[in-house]
């Protein structure tokens, strides 16, 4: 069975911490997979946040094992598609 921490939450909603890198990493370290909300902005780059882009991140973070990426805008989906390997 796979347990997925929604936005890093493992004990119910916590809007103060969800989608923050440290919170997500803590859930991963405890054995959970994590769904995260990903945005891309042409000026600000990659960001996490549910209702709006809040927390800047490096693209390499998105390559972390056991993350489920929820693209929150079309730019995020487009940018991710440029990094997808196809056969």
Task: Report the location of each language-model feature.
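Phosphate-group recognition and catalysis centered on beta-loop-alpha active-site segments
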Residues: 1-87
């Amino acid at each position: 069975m796979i347990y997925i921490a929604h936005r890093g939450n493992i004990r119910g909603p916590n809007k103060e911490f969800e989608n923050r890198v440290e919170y997500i990493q803590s859930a991963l370290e405890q054995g959970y997979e994590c769904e995260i909300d990903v945005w891309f902005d042409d000026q600000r780059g990659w960001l996490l946040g549910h209702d709006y882009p809040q927390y800047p991140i490096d693209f390499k973070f998105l390559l972390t094992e056991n993350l489920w990426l929820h693209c929150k805008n079309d730019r995020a989906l487009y940018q991710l598609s440029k990094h997808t390997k196809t056969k």
